[in-house]
Structures are given as C-alpha cells and as structure tokens.
Swiss-Prot record:
It is found in: Cytoplasm. Its EC number is 2.7.2.3. GO terms for biological process: gluconeogenesis; glycolytic process. It holds the Pfam family PGK. PANTHER family: PHOSPHOGLYCERATE KINASE, PHOSPHOGLYCERATE KINASE 1, CHLOROPLASTIC-RELATED. This is Phosphoglycerate kinase. It catalyses: (2R)-3-phosphoglycerate + ATP = (2R)-3-phospho-glyceroyl phosphate + ADP. One of its GO terms (molecular function) is ATP binding. ATP binds at residues 206, 297, 328, 354-357. PROSITE patterns: PGLYCERATE_KINASE (PS00111). It comes from Campylobacter concisus (strain 13826). The keyword Disulfide bond does not apply. Belongs to the phosphoglycerate kinase family. Monomer.
C-alpha cells in the first residue's frame, strides 16, 4: 500500500483543496436520501483538510444524467445532508464550472466548504475530457481522490485531472486508502477457508472476476439471476428464468475450472418462482433444475439458504458481491436477507462489495456486523480481477 501517495504526506497548510468524493447515494421518489453511508465515509478526509486550515471544494457525480441539468440528479440534497452531519455550512454552487461555481470558489475562505453541482451535468466528465479536467483543477492547489467507487472509470475528475498536479500536490484520501488496502490484502492474504458469494443478475459483469477468484478461493457460491446460466450449462430446465445464452459455454468452463482446481462450486437447489415479476403474482417453491415452462426463478428458496449456510459455516473470509434474488421486491428479497444474516452469524472476516449488496445488508439490519462494506462495486470487482484502475494508477509513487 505504501506505493500510493497519501494525504498524510501533503503539505496542506491553509491551501485550497479539491476533493473528488463519491456521493452517488440512493434516493427515494421524493429525492430523500435513503442511505447516507457514502457521505459519512467522506468525512474523515474533509475534516482532516479543515483541521489543516484549508478551504475545501467537493465534487461528485450522482446517477447518470443524460443531457445536462436534471433536478433529480442535483447534489443540493447531498450538500444539505453533509452540512447536517458536519454541523457546519456547506456552500452549494448551482453549476460545475460556470460563473456560480467559480465566483463562490474564489471567495472561499479557510475553513469553508463548497460543493459544486453534479459533475456529470458536464458532458466532458464521462469522456475524460482534458479541457474540463483543467478547469476543475483550478478549484484547488491540491487534488485528493476519495472516491473508490469511480476509480475504475477514466473520467475527467478521476483520471485526466491528475495530469495537472505533480506528486507533491495529489494523493488518495483516507477512504480510498482504506478501500485499496483492504481489497489488496483480501486477495493476497485471505484467512482460509475463503468463500466467495457471487450474485446479481448477469454473468457478463462478473465473468472476469470469477476467473480470477477461482484460483484464490476454497469455495464459490453462485446465486441471483446469473445462477440460471450456470444451471442451463448443466442441462437443467430453467423455465423462463433469466438466461445469457451466449455465456452458457463460459459458465461451463468456470464449473470445469473449479473441478480442476478443487474448488467446490455451489448453485441454488431450489428457487422462488413466479410467472410474472409483480407484487400480485402467485409464487411457489420449485427445485432449481425443474422450473416449469412459463415460470421464472426470482429468488433462492429455503433449501438453497440451508445449503449455503452450511457451506459458509467454517469460513474465515467471506467476500459477497451481488444479491441472491430480485431483492427490490419484498417477496423476492428473503433469500438475500437470509444470506446476509447467515454471513454475519459466521466468525469470518466479511467483506461486502457493491451498491446493491450494501443495500441488502442495510435493509437486513446487518451493516454494523459486517467487517467491511466497500463503497465501490465495479471498482472492487476490477481490483479482484487484478486490473490497474485508472483512478489509482496516477496516485502511485513514481519509482
């Protein structure tokens, strides 16, 4: 970890600091923040800068706005929540690099905080546009990246911006350091048995991570919608369940590779099936290999939960990424919630990666019992795949 430039090494005294945070928080239809963990996680870095007499400019994205400003993606609510958590004013700019942001940034005094509007309201952000990055770099003499959740994206505020700072003026914040550290140790030195629990709807998003995990884990549990592609590759009847036809062969190879490496791979043995995905639809428990035509599996069933519970009972490390069913709807959330309970009942070091999985754990009331909840789903997957992340690479010390 020592090769990452750290905020501790910077001479910040009284400077203006630009911090890239990850305030991409879930909201309900009334734009109320339903989980502020990402906002709270950013506080140690912000406080450290304030304690060093700095003025602080904060930037983040929220959601995926398509064409410029959209009220539902405004960071105004985030600024209010942060202000409450810090118990001090957070000045809000109504644009990203427009007049309002520039005027307020110039007037910023030591100990003051300014949050600029959603970075993705600027088209150039997701294109890693250097002109935008240069404008953003003018907000601070120092650049701090504390947004692990976007480090796998080469975006203006994550990658291009680092070109405008030398080693003495850019670094990782405390949250980013903690996340990188944790992910790297987990992969290099897990306590064994090491069990990975992988869910979510798509195999495609997790394929590379599965290949990379297999040589490292002792057991692998596959749940969620992605399990059906694996069941299909074994010739089972999955009815109308989610299937990625083009990945059946890949699924077969992963199961084969598991055999060769002596890694036991567990799939659901029963599912909660329905004919349509709706709150009114009738449901029934059916064996995972005999889902009737016209029915689809939308959650793991009670026998699968019992099986998975046994599989993780002796684990010393559990890494969980992806829910076990369509947890957004109550009647298909039981598998994920019971999985969460089962994981905290073990004596293992428990690591949760990804927004959906973090939501499940929060909903299950288990967040405080997990050893570590990673704020970045895609980023933690890519670290596990052994990739160099575009947001982290420029923060490595030069040899």
């Amino acid at each position: 970890m020592s090769d990452i430039l750290s905020i501790n090494d910077l001479e910040l005294n009284g400077a203006k600091v630009f911090i890239r945070c990850d305030f991409n928080v879930p909201m309900d239809e009334f734009l109320n923040i339903t989980d502020d963990r990402r906002i709270r996680s950013a506080i140690p870095t912000i406080r450290y800068c304030l304690d060093n007499g700095c003025s602080v400019v904060l930037a983040s994205h929220l959601g995926r706005p398509k064409n410029g400003y959209e009220e539902k993606f405004s960071l105004q609510g985030v600024a209010k929540r942060l202000s409450r958590l810090l118990d001090r004013e957070v000045i809000f700019a109504e644009d990203v690099i427009g007049n309002d942001a520039k005027t307020k940034a110039e007037a910023l005094k030591a100990g003051e905080i300014l949050m600029i509007e959603n970075l993705r309201f600027e088209k150039g952000e997701t294109k890693n546009d250097e002109a935008l990055a240069k404008e953003l770099s003018e907000f601070g003499e120092f650049y701090i990246n504390d947004a692990f959740g976007v480090c796998h994206r080469a975006h203006s505020s994550v990658e291009a911006i680092t070109k405008f700072y030398d080693e003495k003026h850019k670094a990782a914040g405390f949250l980013l350091q903690k996340e990188i550290n944790f992910a790297q140790n987990l992969i290099k030195h897990p306590s064994r048995p090491f069990v990975a629990v992988v869910g979510g709807s798509k195999v495609s998003g997790k394929l590379q991570a599965l290949h990379n995990l297999l040589p490292r884990v002792d057991k692998l549990i596959i749940g969620g919608g992605m399990a059906f592609t694996f069941l299909k590759s074994l010739g089972e009847n999955i009815g109308n369940s989610l299937l990625e036809e083009e990945l059946i062969e890949d699924a077969r190879q992963i199961l084969q590779k598991g055999k060769e490496l002596g890694v036991k791979i567990y799939l659901p043995v029963d599912v909660v099936a329905a004919q349509t995905f709706s709150a009114e639809s009738a449901v029934k428990y059916v064996p995972a290999q005999e889902i009737p035509n016209g029915w689809m599996g939308l959650d793991i069933g009670p026998a699968s939960i019992r099986l998975f519970k046994e599989v993780i009972a002796d684990a010393q490390t559990i890494w969980w990424n992806g829910p076990m069913g369509v947890f957004e709807m109550d009647k298909f959330s039981k598998g994920s919630i019971k999985m969460s309970h089962a994981i905290i009942d073990t004596h293992a070091t428990t690591v949760v990666g990804g927004g959906d999985t973090a939501d499940v754990v929060e909903r299950a009331g288990d967040a405080d019992e997990m050893t570590f909840i990673s704020t970045g789903g895609g980023a933690s997957l890519e670290l596990i795949e052994g990739k160099e992340l575009p947001g982290i690479k420029p923060l490595r010390k030069e040899e």
